[in-house]
A protein has these predicted regions:
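Short, solvent-exposed loop/turn elements at beta->coil junctions and helix N-caps
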Residues: 74-81, 193-198
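Conserved beta-strand in the GNAT
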Residues: 91, 98-108, 116
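Short amphipathic alpha-helix that is part of the acyltransferase structural core
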Residues: 30-79, 89-93
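Acyl-donor binding region in acyl/amide transferases
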Residues: 112, 117-214
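Conserved N-terminal entry element of GNAT/NAT acetyltransferase domains
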Residues: 2-51
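Short, small/polar residue-rich loop motifs at catalytic or cofactor-binding pockets
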Residues: 84-87
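Charge-rich, low-complexity intrinsically disordered segments
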Residues: 201-267
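Structured alpha-helical
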Residues: 100, 106, 163, 230, ...
Length: 267
């Protein structure tokens, strides 16, 4: 009994220590955000939480992919992995009229291997830890599209940092691969090597990865021109509060009370 009491006290101490640590992290993050220069954009970025939002994201994908892969774009629709646990869809929308301006899908390996792992065998150093893969990037054309793209890249980093991701993995076609290279992502395989990817229509892609925990330091040391924009500017228009993307209806029963009707909940 004494051992159980000691174990219980130890567990309470550990849990209390963890909760205290989380509170400290939240306070530290709030303090850092308060010191950043605020900047407003003519659009917002959020995690989609309803089917009509997902349709907006697909609309952007079709337009964006249609510029380079029209036949592929025509067949694009909501994909099963859009609703997978551990996956979020970012959606950029105009503040003026709510029109969709950009989107990106982020899948983590919390519940299942990344999509890229169905196409290639990742090296040992990239197999362990928490991983995230960004796919289905699409933005509107013109100047606004370029700004939206940079904000989506920033949102990707912030989300990975928020979720304590160790490595971000990217599969990119040319010439988008050079943009990730400019953001200090590095080749996972051969230098600038393109590999057909089964999970994205067997199109040749370059596989790159970025270590989340050292990104700030690396960008600062490299005097990256976007360092201030990404790390020292607060964009309140980015809302990365968690949302559940699994929209299927789930029947939940209560065996102890058979007289209570089953209720369908959206997951």
């Amino acid at each position: 009994m004494e051992q159980l009491n000691q174990a219980g006290q130890s567990s309470v101490f550990r849990n209390g220590h963890i909760e205290h640590g989380k509170r400290a992290e939240r306070l530290e993050l709030a303090a850092v955000q308060a010191l950043k220069k605020p900047e407003s954009m003519p659009f917002t970025i959020r995690i989609v939480s309803a089917d009509h939002d997902l349709q907006k994201a697909v609309q952007v994908r079709r337009v964006a992919y249609g510029r380079h892969l029209p036949a592929f774009a025509e067949k694009m629709a909501v994909e099963a992995c859009d609703r997978d646990p551990g996956t979020v869809i970012l959606l950029a929308e105009s503040k003026l009229d709510g029109a969709p301006l950009g989107t990106m899908r982020i899948q983590t390996n919390e519940y299942a291997p990344l999509g890229v792992q169905g196409s290639v065998e990742l090296p040992a150093w990239l197999k362990s830890g928490r991983l995230a893969e960004a796919t289905r990037l699409g933005v509107a054309g013109g100047t606004i599209g370029r700004v939206v793209k940079m904000m989506l890249f920033k949102s990707l980093f912030l989300y990975c940092e928020q979720q304590q991701i160790d490595w971000t993995v990217i599969t990119a076609r040319s010439p988008l691969d050079r943009e990730y290279e400019a953001m200090l992502f590095e080749d996972v395989f051969g230098y600038r090597q393109f590999i057909p990817m089964a999970h994205v229509g067997n199109l040749p892609h370059r596989v790159l990865a970025g270590e989340v925990g050292v990104a700030r330091r690396r960008w600062e040391e490299a005097k990256h021109p976007l360092f201030q924009f990404v790390f020292q500017t607060h964009h309140a228009d980015i809302d990365l509060r968690a949302a559940d993307l699994s929209f299927e209806r789930e029947t939940v029963g209560c065996p102890e009370a058979p007289q209570v009707a089953q209720v369908a909940y959206g997951r």
